[in-house]
Regions:
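Short, acidic Ser/Thr/Gly-rich low-complexity loop/linker segments typical of extracellular
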Residues: 62-80
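Bacterial N-terminal signal peptides
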Residues: 10-22
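Hydrophobic beta-strand segments
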Residues: 54-59
Length: 148
């Protein structure tokens, strides 16, 4: 009899353990798809040579939360941030060393197919946003510009 009571007491926990992963996974996947904003670009020295292992910081000005990335041997960095549809127009500060660039988040909040992001390049003490180059750079780096 005590064994049945133990099993009866454990049954709700076992059901939750089996069902909970299935309930949580879709939410995580949806969050990944609709809340990603990528900041990528290149870091070069004043002579135009790539800077490897440089740290790049992207700060969400509204909250102060920051995201970090580092350059590879080509000077390329890719920083993934979490910004939802409501974040259009929000300010981000992209910083490498003492050089920074403040940008406004821009994307079509109704488009949940194309990757969202911008390109910011650092050369010497200058930082320049090249939003129009984002898709072509992403295609060269990753090979896709749409979400699956």
């Amino acid at each position: 009899m005590p064994r049945r009571r133990v099993l009866a007491a454990l049954l709700p926990s076992l059901v939750l353990a089996v069902l909970l992963p299935g309930l949580v996974a879709p939410a995580a996947a949806e969050h990944e798809i609709f809340y990603r904003f990528t900041v990528l670009g290149y870091v070069k020295d004043a002579r135009g040579k790539p800077v490897a292992e440089a740290t790049v910081q992207v700060v969400r000005d509204k909250t102060g939360f920051s995201y970090l990335g580092a350059t590879d041997a080509r000077g390329l960095f890719v920083v993934l941030t979490r910004l939802g549809d409501e974040s259009v127009g929000e300010a981000l500060t992209v910083r490498q060393g003492t050089t920074e660039r403040r940008i406004a988040v821009a994307f079509d909040p109704t488009n949940h197919t194309d990757e969202r992001g911008t390109r910011v390049d650092f050369e010497g003490a200058r930082a320049m946003e090249h939003a129009a180059w984002f898709r072509s750079t992403l295609l060269n780096v990753v090979g896709v510009t749409t979400r699956h």
